[in-house]
Amino acid sequence: MGVVSQGPVYYDLFEEFADLATQGMCPLGAPDERGHKDGWGLACFQDGALKFHMRDAGSAADASKYYGTAWKIAKLNIERAPGRSLIVMGHLRRASSKGLVAQRFAHPFVEERNGVTWAFQHNGSLVSTPVDGDKIDSQILFQMLLNHLEGREHEAVAKATLTARALAIKEFGGFTGLNFMLSDGRSLHVYRDFQTNGQYYTLYLDNLGEMIVAASEPILAMKAEPIPRGLLHTVSSDLVLQRTAVS
């Protein structure tokens, strides 16, 4: 989930999102017992600065820390002051391997580069992930993006995405899904791509008035039409949308 809002981000949204931990679509085409209960995380930028970052192993639907953090975020910008903005990212994890269920592997991941704080979350996996107990494939993808970013603007992220995609194919044999959201606090970048199971690796994007919401499955009153594969969408803090074909 990713939200760019000029007002508050309602608590109802966090509740509905948490329900996807048990009710969300799974790779076989329907919810299953495993669900997306191997980790959760929330990151919130207020006016470009990282305000909250909380994550843990386990299911968001059962986590008091998840709801507590969501409540704190929901109280921000209630006054709708002009020029203020919120960018919120949320992730529910379904681990590719049960041995990799741990807090440190919960998304979104946050890293500072050249004075800029980036948050990143991903759905999918690399075909041949290196045996490295310190990083999962999503973290490797994050590093590839950051290593090839030449700026913060839409065009720079599109270029880095193209390079990271090519490296994923060349060095790791490709990917199942390359769906990700990336933010520097000023914009939210949303990308959908897959080489298998496109009915599972979906991403939806909708303008709900004072906020634009992106999610793997429609929540609240989002339209049920996924964004096209291979098209990077960038939402600025003033809700301007840019698109660029990457693949």
Label each region the model flagged.
Residues 25-31, 87, 154-194:
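Catalytic core of PPM/PP2C metal-dependent serine/threonine phosphatase domains
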Residues 132-170:
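Glycine- and acidic-residue-rich phosphate-binding/metal-coordinating active-site segment common to enzymes
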Residues 1-66, 190, 195-198, 230-247:
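Extreme N-terminus nucleophile/cap motif
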Residues 3, 88-91:
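A short, Trp-centered hydrophobic/proline-enriched beta-strand micro-motif
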Residues 42, 89, 141, 180, ...:
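A residue-level signal for conserved active-site and pocket-lining positions in enzyme catalytic cores
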Residues 196-231:
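A conserved acidic, glycine/proline-rich C-terminal tail/linker
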Residues 118-128:
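Conserved beta-strand-loop-short alpha-helix elements that form
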Residues 57-77, 91-114:
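Short acidic (Asp/Glu) patches
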